[in-house]
Amino acid sequence: MSEISAKHISDVIGLLNDNADYAVLRNFEGLPDNNKSRDIDIIITRKSYVALKSELLKLIDSSGWKIITYLHSDRLITYVCGFSCGEHIELVQWDFFFNTSVWGILLMDASEFVQHRQFNGFLYYMEVEYQFLDKYLYNRAVGSQFPDKYAWMREKASQNLVVKQKIKAVFRVNSIEECDNIDSHILVMRAIAANYLQRPLDSIGNVLLFLWTFIRNYICSNTGFSIGFTGPD
């Protein structure tokens, strides 16, 4: 990674450190000098993001970087930032997640993540069990199994009490193994029930927000589609 990208990452992380309840979800070990994948996944409370958005945009613009792709969905805001270096373009993608959810159905909110974040001297990050929960809850809800390439993560997190309690609260199962063998439609219905029992008004609002952003981004938009290739996350 170039010094230009490393400085850009350092500047944005510095802003987040000073102003936001956030954490980097994964692939944070080499930052800012070594970014394992072009995109950097941030879990952040919606309140924190709204409060620092204008400062973030000012920082990006004042440093010579340009936002070349922008996506705003119900659970995620993406900035693909580019910097022209003559014959090539430096790219850094920031993915700001407000929660782990599917179709507006909340599985785990950012506030649940960031209250357990750790600091390594440069950035806030999530421990393995929370990295696992983010991926596992989402994958099972959409009908996918946990990726084999993250088997090491599953092995480390599967017996963790926090993991067991969260999966039980969302999907009403007693173990990961049980969850693996239940149809995703049943898991989603259980997640919906858990949401409406705990926070009925918020649950309705989340689904409406999903529908509104989906229609705006993919049905009413006339900007077309783009295909991007990123590294492992």
Ranges and model annotations:
Residues 1-40, 44-225:
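Conserved NTP-donor binding/palm subdomain of two-metal-ion nucleotidyltransferases/polymerases, i.e.
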Residues 227-229:
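Hydrophobic anchor at the beta1->P-loop junction of P-loop NTPases
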